[in-house]
């Protein structure tokens, strides 16, 4: 991108706001070097990455990036053998902890079912150096001091130091507390000079204590003397301190060498956390400006819904819908100055730059944006005093440069095209420049106050007029963009509101040609029609949203009803099974009792009477249980019966064996000790499988009442999407849905084409079509099922 384009579109101001959300100098360095990408795949991945970080912030509120610092120079020094200071080593340990903590944070979210594939890939590159981290923190305290426990030798030396200091203080305090000493000392204190303990002695008593004078007061009346009696003790203390320093240096060198061994891993981890800091800064900034992830396409069109400029307070700015690249490739915004035209122009430019930098943009969901190889902008008054260029000349220098470089992959933004010269010539130049850029296939947004360009949009197929709405009642622009309506000056209406007489205004109208008046009246009617159409659309949109809400509520109630019904059926079935089981047990008991009675010759009971008794008892079983007991394999075509086959006599519910066929429809059947004739229609063939064979058992899948009426495939890879479509259509048919919607987005069109090719071949599909305006348009396919 041209540096001038980034400057006039205030890209660096966006980066300054982004910097406020970084957690470390590592992230800040990434932001400072941020420039828009022109690679489609890279931009899509950056947008997806920012979206994952935004999801983390929505779920967790923040990310644990604290304690991370830029330790790269320290690690590189360790590699070449320089000894690191305690604080430098502590920074390394803290950064290692921060990277390890960040890795655990993301992995825990993934383990809990949050889908973060890109962030998961990032943290997978972090290698835990827990042992090195603990070695450093075990040796260095939070304040940057080497602790006693760093080594046994250091602990012993410091014990000696404390003992020596205690003995020295004790001796000196005894000296200062004596009654004789009071008159010889300037103050009864023990202090330190040149790292040796001393006492403040008056000048005239310097010879009383002997020893060494280390300092004197500003007046010269007080000498700081190390008495002779503690010279040896101070010497011993100094020797211990030298040993302490040597041991500390040994420990620091040892830790530095440990860092040098793992230097490459540490530097790799630093790069990962730098990227994570940068990524989460983007997500926090998106939250700040209420931005969303745009759909990125490679088809050179954009659809910005309710777009806002990120540098203007969202509570103040008026959002606008801006479309470019489908029905028209050029927008010409006409109308008076100070009407918000330049803000609209800059909004388009900065949204494109942000999106191509992986930043979410301040628009509504489902907004689309395309990738431009070049963005050219001629905005503002940039006169060059050194080159003595006028406003017009300055603009023309930029325009000449743009015309040399613009092509079909370019976005060109012109502010007040042709301004600064004779209006008639300026308008003619503006038209020629627009024709030249449009013929190259570039996407163009231009602003102008020349009325001649109002007709330009009507005479060119790929060009559309637009204006910024002006409220005559308040005498101020509303900053609302009106696509398809050219701007008008409103001079007469403003003058009338300010008190100019009707007579003067009418005379002024007479000075304007009839054609001009007709055009102004036509524009006024267009504005009114636009307002009415927008009002109607808003009402329709509100009704659509209300309908969707009612639909979702109805679907929820249907699901709840079906769940409750299924629950009651299961409960009833269970109760029925329990009753049947009880009846069977009772029947078996009765039959057993009757058989025992017959054996005892206490009753003259026949087997067929026993069978009939049991059949009557089983007849009391609930119908649902009988249905449940029918095996799927029995619904197959009727088996060819042969003598010796085992069958079930349905009337009695008993198993029997076929003896011989006595007629076309009857068989002689052996049931226990009883032989009887049974019709084929009253028997069921029992297939007894061989032990060595395994038969496939058919299963019947019930309806799933939790199938959604929509399938969202956006972001899916082609193969995964097709597999999901296949399963979804099967589930929808089982759920008896008459119609479903498949959301594939507009994108490159590959996924949309793949879905519709599949639907053409699916036997369960009756018809399909694109969604209507309220259903998602070309981004949705509505499927009618058989």
UniProtKB/Swiss-Prot annotation:
InterPro entries: DNA_mismatch_repair_MutS_C, DNA_mismatch_repair_MutS_core, DNA_mismatch_repair_MutS_sf, MSSS, MutS, MutS2, P-loop_NTPase, Smr_dom
Top EC group: hydrolase
Pfam families given in the database record: MSSS (PF20297), MutS_V (PF00488), Smr (PF01713)
Role according to the record: Endonuclease that is involved in the suppression of homologous recombination and thus may have a key role in the control of bacterial genetic diversity.
Superkingdom of the source species: Bacteria
SMART domains xrefs: MUTSac, MUTSd, SMR
Subunit structure: Homodimer. Binds to stalled ribosomes, contacting rRNA.
GO annotation terms (biological process): mismatch repair; negative regulation of DNA recombination; rescue of stalled ribosome
Family affiliation: Belongs to the DNA mismatch repair MutS family. MutS2 subfamily.
Span of domain Smr: 711-786
Gene expressing this chain: mutS2
Keyword RNA-binding (UniProt): yes
GO MF annotation list: ATP binding; ATP hydrolysis activity; ATP-dependent DNA damage sensor activity; endonuclease activity; mismatched DNA binding; ribosomal large subunit binding; rRNA binding
NCBIfam families, alphabetized: mutS2
Residues annotated as binding ATP: 335-342
Known EC number: 3.1.-.-, 3.6.4.-
Organism: Bacillus cereus (strain ATCC 10987 / NRS 248)
Keywords: ATP-binding, DNA-binding, Endonuclease, Hydrolase, Nuclease, Nucleotide-binding, RNA-binding, rRNA-binding
Protein name: Endonuclease MutS2
């Amino acid at each position: 991108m041209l540096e001038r384009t980034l400057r006039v579109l205030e890209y660096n101001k966006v980066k300054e706001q982004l910097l406020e959300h970084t957690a470390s100098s590592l992230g800040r360095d990434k932001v400072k070097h941020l420039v828009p990408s022109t690679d489609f795949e890279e931009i899509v991945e950056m947008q997806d990455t920012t979206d994952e970080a935004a999801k983390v912030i929505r779920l967790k509120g923040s990310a644990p990036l604290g304690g991370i610092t830029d330790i790269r120079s320290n690690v590189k020094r360790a590699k070449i053998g320089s000894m690191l200071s305690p604080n430098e080593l502590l920074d390394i340990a803290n950064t290692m902890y921060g990277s390890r903590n960040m890795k655990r944070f993301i992995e825990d979210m993934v383990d809990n079912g949050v889908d973060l594939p890109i962030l998961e890939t990032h943290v997978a590159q972090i290698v835990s150096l827990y042992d090195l981290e603990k070695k450093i923190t075990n040796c260095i305290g939070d304040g940057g001091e080497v602790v006693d426990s760093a080594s046994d030798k250091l602990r012993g030396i410091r014990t000696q130091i404390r003992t020596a200091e205690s003995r020295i203080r004790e001796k000196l305090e005894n000296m200062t507390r004596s009654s004789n000493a009071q008159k010889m000392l300037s103050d009864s204190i023990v202090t330190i000079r040149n790292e040796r303990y001393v006492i403040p002695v008056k000048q005239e008593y310097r010879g009383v204590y002997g020893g060494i004078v280390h300092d004197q007061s500003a007046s010269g009346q007080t000498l700081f003397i190390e008495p002779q009696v503690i010279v040896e003790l101070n010497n011993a203390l100094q020797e211990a301190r030298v040993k302490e320093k040597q041991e500390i240096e040994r420990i620091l060198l040892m830790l530095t060498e440990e860092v040098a061994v793992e230097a490459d891993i540490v530097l790799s981890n630093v790069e990962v956390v730098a990227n994570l800091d940068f990524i989460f800064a983007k997500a926090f900034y998106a939250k700040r400006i209420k931005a969303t992830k745009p759909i990125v396409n490679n088809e050179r069109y954009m659809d910005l819904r309710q777009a806002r400029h990120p540098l203007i307070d969202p509570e103040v700015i008026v959002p606008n819908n801006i479309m470019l690249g489908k029905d028209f490739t050029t927008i010409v915004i006409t109308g008076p100055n100070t009407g918000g035209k330049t803000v609209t122009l800059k909004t388009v430019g900065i949204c494109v730059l942000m999106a191509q930098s992986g930043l979410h943009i301040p628009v509504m969901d489902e907004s689309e944006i395309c990738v431009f190889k070049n963005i050219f902008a001629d905005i503002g008054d940039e006169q060059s005093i050194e080159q003595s260029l006028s406003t017009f000349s300055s603009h023309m220098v930029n325009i000449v440069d743009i015309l040399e470089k613009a092509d079909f992959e370019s976005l060109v933004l012109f502010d007040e095209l042709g301004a600064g010269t004779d209006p008639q010539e300026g308008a003619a130049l503006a038209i020629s420049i627009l024709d030249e850029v449009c013929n190259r296939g570039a996407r163009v947004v231009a602003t102008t106050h020349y009325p001649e360009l109002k007709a330009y949009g009507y005479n060119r197929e790929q060009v559309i007029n637009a204006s910024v709405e002006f409220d005559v009642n308040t005498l101020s622009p509303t900053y609302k963009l009106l696509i398809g309506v050219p701007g008008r000056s409103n001079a007469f209406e403003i003058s009338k509101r300010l008190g100019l007489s009707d007579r003067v205004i009418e005379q002024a109208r007479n000075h304007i040609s009839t054609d001009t008046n007709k055009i102004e009246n036509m524009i006024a009617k267009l504005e009114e029609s636009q307002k009415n159409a927008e009002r109607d659309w808003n009402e329709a949109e509100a009704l659509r949203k209300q309908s969707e809400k009612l639909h979702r509520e109805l679907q929820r109630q249907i699901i709840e009803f079906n769940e409750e019904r299924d629950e009651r059926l299961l409960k009833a079935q269970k109760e029925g099974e329990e009753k049947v089981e009880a009846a069977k047990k009772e029947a078996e008991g009765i039959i057993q009792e009757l058989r025992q009675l017959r054996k005892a010759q206490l009753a003259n009971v026949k087997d067929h009477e026993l069978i009939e008794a049991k059949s009557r008892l089983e007849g009391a079983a609930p119908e649902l249980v009988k249905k449940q007991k029918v095996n799927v394999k029995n619904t197959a075509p009727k088996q060819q019966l042969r003598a010796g086959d085992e069958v079930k006599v349905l009337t009695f519910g008993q198993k029997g064996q076929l003896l011989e066929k006595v007629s076309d429809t009857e068989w002689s059947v052996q049931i226990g000790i009883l032989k009887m004739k049974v019709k084929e229609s009253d028997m069921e063939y029992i297939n007894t499988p061989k032990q060595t064979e395994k038969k496939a058992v058919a299963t019947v899948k019930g309806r799933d009442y939790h199938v959604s009426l929509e399938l969202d495939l956006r972001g899916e890879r082609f193969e995964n999407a097709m597999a999901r479509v296949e399963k979804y259509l099967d589930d929808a048919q089982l759920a008896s849905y008459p119609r479903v919607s498949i959301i594939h987005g507009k994108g490159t069109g590959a996924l949309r084409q793949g879905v519709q090719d599949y639907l053409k071949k699916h036997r369960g599909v009756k018809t399909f079509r694109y969604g209507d305006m309220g259903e998602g348009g070309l981004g949705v396919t509505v499927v009618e099922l058989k």
